[in-house]
Amino acid sequence: MAKLNPFEISQKQLDICADILNLDSGTHAILRVPMRELHVSIPIRMDDGTIKVFQGFRVQYNDVKGPTKGGIRFHPDETIDTVRALAAWMTWKCALVDIPLGGGKGGIICNPKELSQGELERLSRTYIDKVFQFIGPDQDIPAPDVYTTPQIMSWMMDEYSKIAGKNQFGVITGKPMCIGGSVGRTDATARGGWYCVREAAKEFGIDLKGATVAIQGYGNAGYYAALLGQTIFGSTIVAVSDSKGGIYNAAGLDAQAVYEHKAKTGSVIDFPGSEPITNEDLLELDVDVLVPAALEHVITGENAAKIRAKIVAEVANGPTTPDADDILHENGIHVIPDFLCNAGGVTVSYFEMVQNFNRYCWTEEEVHERLDERMTAAYHATLRGSKKYDVNMRRSAYVVAIERVVEAMETRGWV
């Protein structure tokens, strides 16, 4: 059987939820396809004087609840179906955390590692030239994603502002603080995930103070998951890993010290006082909380039965395959699905938009308080849905989100 592409996967997820919700055929048909998509050719003069034409996309999946929102990806293997799927998932993610936005996503087929700083800037600015009429603070708001940075967002915001003839800080989120970025964005994904873990721990009678945690992946999300778990919730981080391998210490690892060790050596491996552990064995540790924070499809039908964590908090995108999901659910392991668990990022991006519109900067405490409120409400809505429809947490998250989008469509007279 041929492997399904991401958009076919997203459509199948929708089809299952449409049956649960008894959606009529017209509503179902509207939700299966993007509202709008743009394909652009982006000619760039390279540093050697030649002209190279790049291909780019912007997909706006559904804007019934508000302007579309989603990142821009620079990747050599980017495809329109990947962008379509990610735009669909952004639609459901925004609805789940109940922010007044729809889902969008963009991408350029390129390898940013092969481009100079000047070529990256010209590519970023020309992309905005090509999509200018389709984006805007009230229409579609891009953000960073794979291989795009706050600096790239700065160039894009500046280019949009030049064409518009006035400053438009709210057209892009994920900007540096000095030009309208928001405090609390750096650790928002991990922090939002921990708010969900806290609520799950209450539900299952787990005391997070002293609870054992294993984290696969020690990039931005994994590092902050370890740091916040240790410093705010008092949990014991017993294992972490990166692409080169993992480390284990039953008494606990110092998250900041491990981060500094990785910055110095290029990996978490060989951290003083730790034992080596493979990424595969880390997933199977007997811990209270397992945090996949790196690759997709690491929990599969082959290893799901060996997972012993009480809670799996999916900070990474797509770490669990559908067949593994069923096994974990049957074994009583509580999975906080990715597009709930990692929704802190888009939530604080929304907060950045609000601050830009009002020209008023919130304090870090205000950002954290509002993020906590959104994530806690989304978690409990998903938990209620799981019990109401007798489905696992992932399916419940989709059902809750799709139900909210459909309600908005009905209210606006779209269906």
Mark where each language-model region is.
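Glycine/serine-rich phosphate-binding loop and adjoining beta1-alpha1 elements at the start
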Residues: 75, 95-208
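Flexible, glycine/charged-enriched surface loops at secondary-structure junctions
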Residues: 24-30, 98, 135-144, 167-170, ...
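Glycine-rich, N-terminal phosphate-binding loop and its surrounding beta-alpha-beta segment
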Residues: 40-112
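Glycine-rich phosphate/diphosphate-binding loop of Rossmann-like nucleotide-binding domains
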Residues: 176, 181-284
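Adenosine-phosphate binding glycine-rich loop
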Residues: 3-4, 200-201, 305-415
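Short, Gly/Pro- and small/polar-rich lid/capping loops
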Residues: 2-41
